[in-house]
């Protein structure tokens, strides 16, 4: 898998090492959802390491319902032109043509995202065929390893997007971390059984067991609305944070964005966290995840 796969519309190649290296450069940072060039500029000024360009933040996607698809190319290009930091954009699970379009537009990363309506309930995108690196969500180690096998260069624990409720984010991050720790104590013959249970290649399972971590960057997402939320996820083992509705659905987006960036950097310093948490205004109202019926939970999408 170290050899590059080539996309039909490009004569460039992107090896796993290059793609994963690009994701490594975002470690320790915050990636913010933005729907306009102005929001993108606010995110960049606040210290975001990248922005996610989309037409509706997850809270609006959840509230408005219907089929949610890739954003309009004009909107994505407007955000690319507005900032100097990397720009990500979302494609539907399994929709390889949306991914081809996003690569053609020149986005820096494609997020094969459960926030959008899945296009294929059996297959995820073959990410090895693309030069652009992919981000994918996971609720457990098995999901993460299957996405890496398909070519993902970054994993984000899913959480429950658009809620402002961090409980699922903590559940998924603890689950992934706990399953990795379990692997590290196994003998090689036990790892064969673990690979079957995880539905992942044995060689990849062994690599994780020996390293005690994923071979790609692990961010967190879903329900992060305050500096304390971001710091907690970093203390639980996240290497960076995605923030969606939590910033631009709040009372003071500019200040909250900067506070979450600082909290992500100084996640283990309670004095700094207390300082940046002051006077932020009202956080997004949000939804209690327990009030969302199982079939309507976005984190359930993907397999």
Swiss-Prot record:
Its EC number is 4.3.3.6. Gene3D superfamilies: Aldolase class I. InterPro entries: Aldolase_TIM, PdxS/SNZ, PdxS/SNZ_N, RibuloseP-bd_barrel. It catalyses: aldehydo-D-ribose 5-phosphate + D-glyceraldehyde 3-phosphate + L-glutamine = pyridoxal 5'-phosphate + L-glutamate + phosphate + 3 H2O + H(+). It is an enzyme of class 4 (lyase). SUPFAM superfamilies: Ribulose-phoshate binding barrel. One of its GO terms (biological process) is amino acid metabolic process. D-ribose 5-phosphate binds at residues 33, 162, 223, 244-245. In the presence of PdxT, forms a dodecamer of heterodimers. Belongs to the PdxS/SNZ family. NCBIfam families: PRK04180.1, pyridoxal 5'-phosphate synthase lyase subunit PdxS. Catalyzes the formation of pyridoxal 5'-phosphate from ribose 5-phosphate (RBP), glyceraldehyde 3-phosphate (G3P) and ammonia. The ammonia is provided by the PdxT subunit. Can also use ribulose 5-phosphate and dihydroxyacetone phosphate as substrates, resulting from enzyme-catalyzed isomerization of RBP and G3P, respectively. This is Pyridoxal 5'-phosphate synthase subunit PdxS. It comes from Mycolicibacterium smegmatis (strain ATCC 700084 / mc(2)155). The gene is pdxS.
